[in-house]
């Protein structure tokens, strides 16, 4: 089957914004004007097409990135048909991992801002993520019909708060109740949308007389931004020659793609004004898959490889989201970077070295789905029924394996116990947690052997809050949550030799006898974590009992003598012992080994290790003193700070146990304007006072 839309006419874009900037309504209007949905969905009615989880409709917020395919040929049908894959991303700070996931598979983004609220804290976080992945973007200032709307104030905030080189492409005609439409600064015409047909048609009119002067000034600003794209245009512009519409648009496009400028449009999605012209800007200024650099990866032989956006290259795709669908089970959302795949084809998951068969492939339109037979470079689609794929895995041609930019998921560092409130919740909870763990590789579930409690572990407090919240809303499971627990570790600092362990019961009947002598020594933290060396000579312990000694020690490692935490970075040398022809058994040697291990561990200067987090705080300069003071109180080691005009980045290493409640404290110190990220860095010895308190608490 031939390609329907040439790849140059693809636009893979994200709609990204602070909560309540009207992002979902904007996405809805895109679907309406591109002809996908015939009744406009309103968030106010809980009927929006893009928000498809039940609780999203309840709360009017977006949690999962739904990917939708739409088509657009321009407001005046001036373009050939373009295919726009829209990824609606959450704007809530708690769902930043979702935003980050989708930023990886986008080519361009539309940043939606509220004309009243402007650039809010979460906008700054999303902006930094877009910078990280070098995503070209345009801005849409929404809610121009609201009281207090001020377009130019938001343009100014884009410059001062985000450091963006913001260049208006339009100016609003009127604002608040009098918002009529926009002036196209390239054409120098006012666009008025027809309210009778919900903005499906429009007219170009003359610019209102009282706006002419401002429009001239802003147009000069726009043309100058275009002229700066090349020396040739600059000479023409400085020589007083008029630049043509094509020259201006081509030059602006080049600068947007190079991430040098942000073009700003405006409107009111709710009032059906402006989204249409913003869609034209998506087509004219945002990149197609061929405008962005080839994606890099690692070939089978560990050399660096790459895949260009072409149907002729071998198939390579990145799975960026796993979602559970009530009707079909697992949906794996993936972005095709190169090649073609048909339903029925077998591909290889190069990260897990497993083959997968593409059964059914669907193109998602919010929560409706259309079955398709093939997908090609540039497409975003979902596969049903892939067995063993998680977020960040690469799916590729078995004859040309490549691993695209691997996503590493660190081990969880924080755990809480969850217990179902009722017997009915008990069964549902196991199922719910299993599903959620499958969707999110940074979340784990296990049962505590001693207490029988279900323990969930994740990357931080917020992470676990969301999981519990989703359990309640999606799976209707009510659960009680314990206090957060830090995952400590135990190890030793000095070597001890010739420590004996003897297990002997020989009073009548068949007895038990095992006897071992071991050395215990610390290992390098970068090493294997545990090693067992057998140096028994002359058969003083028969060979069949040696594995039992190893096993006896390994069982002790799960729960250390200090405070019952896992033991790491130790080596054991077994070099002497004795046995009894009749009474010795594997069990007896296992018990002897555990006795020897405990005795040796307690003599070897045991210490408690605590998880240290790498913390990066980004804050406006005026709060730096407060932020650093607070970090110091949390036993932080501040490694340095980098500043630009708008934000100071503070890097620190902080014990995880001191970071509980940090999100709330940081918010109150900085009026919500700072953000932070935290990831596990290493384990380090806990100070004596901290270790003593932890050990004491475990005894209770």
Swiss-Prot record:
Gene: fusA
Matches recorded under SUPFAM superfamilies: EF-G C-terminal domain-like, P-loop containing nucleoside triphosphate hydrolases, Ribosomal protein S5 domain 2-like, Translation proteins
Swiss-Prot/TrEMBL keywords: Cytoplasm, Elongation factor, GTP-binding, Nucleotide-binding, Protein biosynthesis
GO molecular function: GTP binding; GTPase activity; guanosine tetraphosphate binding; translation elongation factor activity
Protein name: Elongation factor G
PANTHER family: RIBOSOME-RELEASING FACTOR 2, MITOCHONDRIAL, TRANSLATION ELONGATION FACTOR G-RELATED
Span of domain tr-type G: 8-290
Compartments in which it is found: Cytoplasm
Similarity section: Belongs to the TRAFAC class translation factor GTPase superfamily. Classic translation factor GTPase family. EF-G/EF-2 subfamily.
Alphabetical list of InterPro entries matching this protein: EFG_II, EFG_III, EFG_III/V, EFG_IV, EFG_V, EFG_V-like, EFTu-like_2, G_TR_CS
Pfam families attached to this UniProt entry: EFG_C, EFG_III, EFG_IV, GTP_EFTU, GTP_EFTU_D2
GO terms, biological process: ribosome disassembly
HAMAP family documented for this protein: EF_G_EF_2_B
Organism: Mannheimia succiniciproducens (strain KCTC 0769BP / MBEL55E)
Annotated binding of GTP, by residue: 17-24, 88-92, 142-145
Role this protein plays: Catalyzes the GTP-dependent ribosomal translocation step during translation elongation. During this step, the ribosome changes from the pre-translocational (PRE) to the post-translocational (POST) state as the newly formed A-site-bound peptidyl-tRNA and P-site-bound deacylated tRNA move to the P and E sites, respectively. Catalyzes the coordinated movement of the two tRNA molecules, the mRNA and conformational changes in the ribosome.
Cellular compartments per GO CC: cytoplasm
């Amino acid at each position: 089957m031939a390609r329907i839309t040439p790849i140059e006419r693809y636009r893979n874009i994200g709609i990204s914004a602070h909560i309540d900037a009207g992002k979902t309504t904007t996405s809805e209007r895109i679907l309406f004007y591109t002809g996908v949905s015939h009744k406009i969905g309103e968030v106010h009615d809980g009927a929006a097409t893009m928000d498809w989880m039940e609780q999203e409709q309840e709360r009017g917020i977006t949690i999962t990135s739904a990917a939708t395919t739409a088509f657009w040929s321009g407001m005046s049908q001036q373009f050939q048909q373009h295919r726009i894959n829209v990824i609606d991303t959450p704007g809530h700070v708690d769902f930043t991992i979702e935003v980050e996931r989708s930023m990886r598979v986008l080519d361009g983004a539309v940043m939606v801002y509220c004309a009243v609220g402007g650039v809010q804290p979460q906008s700054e976080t999303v902006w930094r993520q877009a910078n990280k992945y070098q995503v070209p973007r345009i801005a849409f200032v929404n809610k121009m019909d609201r009281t207090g709307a001020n377009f130019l104030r938001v343009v100014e905030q884009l410059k001062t708060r985000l450091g963006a080189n913001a260049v208006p492409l339009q100016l609003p005609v009127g604002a608040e109740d009098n918002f009529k439409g926009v002036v196209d600064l390239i054409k120098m015409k006012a666009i008025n949308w027809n309210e009778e047909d919900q903005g499906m048609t429009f007219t170009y009119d003359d610019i209102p007389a009282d706006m002419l002067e401002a429009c001239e000034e802003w147009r000069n600003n726009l043309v100058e931004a275009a002229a700066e794209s090349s020396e040739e245009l600059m000479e023409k512009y400085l020589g007083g020659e008029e630049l043509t519409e094509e020259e201006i648009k081509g030059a602006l496009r080049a600068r947007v793609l190079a991430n040098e400028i942000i073009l700003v449009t405006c409107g009111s999605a709710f009032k059906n004004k402006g989204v249409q012209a913003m869609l034209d800007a998506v087509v004219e200024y945002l990149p197609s898959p061929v405008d962005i650099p080839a994606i890099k990866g690692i070939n089978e032989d560990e050399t660096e490889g790459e895949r260009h956006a072409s149907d002729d290259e071998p198939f390579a795709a990145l799975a960026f989201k796993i979602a559970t669908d009530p009707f079909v089970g697992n949906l794996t959302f993936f972005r095709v970077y190169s090649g073609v795949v048909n339903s029925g084809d077998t591909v290889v998951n190069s990260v897990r070295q497993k083959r997968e068969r593409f059964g059914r492939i669907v193109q998602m339109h919010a929560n409706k789905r259309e079955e398709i037979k093939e997908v090609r470079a540039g497409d975003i689609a979902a596969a049903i029924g892939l067995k063993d794929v998680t977020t960040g895995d690469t799916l590729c041609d078995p004859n040309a394996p490549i691993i695209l930019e691997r996503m590493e998921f660190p081990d969880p560092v924080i755990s809480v116990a969850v217990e179902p409130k009722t017997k009915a919740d008990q069964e549902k909870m196991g199922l719910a947690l299993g599903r959620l763990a499958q969707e999110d590789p940074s979340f784990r579930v296990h049962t505590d052997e001693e207490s029988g409690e279900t323990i969930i572990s994740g990357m931080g407090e917020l992470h676990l809050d969301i999981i519990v919240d989703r359990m309640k809303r999606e799976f209707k499971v009510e659960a009680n949550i314990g206090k957060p627990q830090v995952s400590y570790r135990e190890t030793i600092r000095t070597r001890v030799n010739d420590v004996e362990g003897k297990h002997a019961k020989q009073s009548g009947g068949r007895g038990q006898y095992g006897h071992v002598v071991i050395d215990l020594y610390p290992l390098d933290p970068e090493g294997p974590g545990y090693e067992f060396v057998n140096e028994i000579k002359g058969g003083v312990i028969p060979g069949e009992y040696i594995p039992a000694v190893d096993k006896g020690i390994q069982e002790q490692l799960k729960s250390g003598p200090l405070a019952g935490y896992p033991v790491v970075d130790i080596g054991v040398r077994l070099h002497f012992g004795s046995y009894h022809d009749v009474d010795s058994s594997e069990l007896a040697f296992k018990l002897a080994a555990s006795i020897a291990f405990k005795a040796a561990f307690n003599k070897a200067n045991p210490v408690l290790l605590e998880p240290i987090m790498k913390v990066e705080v980004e804050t406006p300069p005026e709060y730096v003193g407060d932020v650093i003071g607070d970090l110091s109180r949390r036993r932080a080691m501040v490694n340095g700070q980098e500043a630009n005009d708008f934000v100071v980045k503070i890097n620190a290493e902080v014990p995880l146990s001191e970071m509980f409640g940090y999100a709330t404290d940081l918010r109150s110190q900085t009026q919500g304007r700072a953000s932070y990220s935290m990831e596990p860095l290493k384990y380090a010895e806990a100070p004596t006072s901290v270790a003593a308190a932890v050990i004491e608490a475990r005894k209770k």
